[in-house]
Amino acid sequence: AIRRQRQMCIRDSFYDSKKSGGITVSHLRFGSSPITSTYLINKANFVACHNPSYVNKYDMVQDLLPGGTFLLNCIWSPEELDANLPASMKRYIAQNNINFYTINGIKIAEEVGLPGRASTILQSAFFTISGILPVDEAIGYMKEKVVAKFSKKGEAVVNSNCNGIDRGSKEVVKIDVPASWADAKDEENDYEVPTNRPEMKKFVKNILHPVDRLHGDDLPVSAFLDSADGVYPQGSAAFEKRGIAVDVPEWDPTKCAQCNLCSMVCPHAVIRPICMNEEEAAAAPEGTKMIKSKRTDYQYALITSV
């Protein structure tokens, strides 16, 4: 829409190295003259975070220019932001006069019949905030695209997307940043890698976690000396829990047939049936649901690993 209606030059870069649901970082440049920059953006005017779990895992605002705009898709009310945002993010927002907006695109998507598909809603919020195009004009272009793309899927799909576009424009919230955020204090992080293998602890702490947080380019060559021959400790996938799901399914023991088919078809081994003896059941984490196994004397539980 920007390129077509304003005769602007556009350059974009999208990259996702993981499987379905992995993080995708999109870099978009546009302007009235040809764009010759071949590098990723590190001084942005606008940054949007589409998944609230990313705020505690990645540096979401550090590439924003002072006075830039940050849009966060989250389920938190303005009053709940202080308790849920990391101190480093709050400091940067306050100290650099960042224009901070939130929108509950997750709730909107569910209510308009597009669960898990908030991208159109957030795009509408982007045009509303940025002022790149007049809001009514931008929304009109978006709806034209929706009709052209989804008309074959029926009127209901078209209406759901159009309703999402309207609500994305109307329900974005401007946050008044508290002055206290400028002095937000970091909490102590005493995370201990849960393994008794010294080489794995070192690998996870020095390489795996920094790479997972997109800080791999900051690692010195010395960090890889123990793996100079290209050999890495096996079993490291257990420490790559991304924790990015907004919603996690809950097992209902009253409706479970203990067939374990759900575990068999789960592609990521997230659903895990477990049988426990009395001692193991007593030592299970607080709140663990369990029932008597139909086939043994053990206690049966279906655990969701996230």
Model-derived features with residue positions:
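Short alpha-helices
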Residues: N84-K149
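Solvent-exposed alpha-helices and their adjacent loops that cap or buttress functional pockets
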Residues: S17-G22, T38-N42, Q62-L64, R91-Q95, ...
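Single conserved hydrophobic/aromatic residue that forms the stacking wall/gate
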Residues: A1-R6, I10
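Ferredoxin-type iron-sulfur electron-transfer modules and their immediate structural context
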Residues: A138-I139, S151-V306
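Alpha-helix C-terminal capping/helix-to-coil transition sites in glycosyltransferase folds
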Residues: Q5, N42-A44, P66
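ADP-ribose/adenylate-binding Rossmann-like module
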Residues: V61-F100
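A structured beta-alpha segment of the ubiquitous adenosine-cofactor-binding alpha/beta core
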Residues: D12-V61
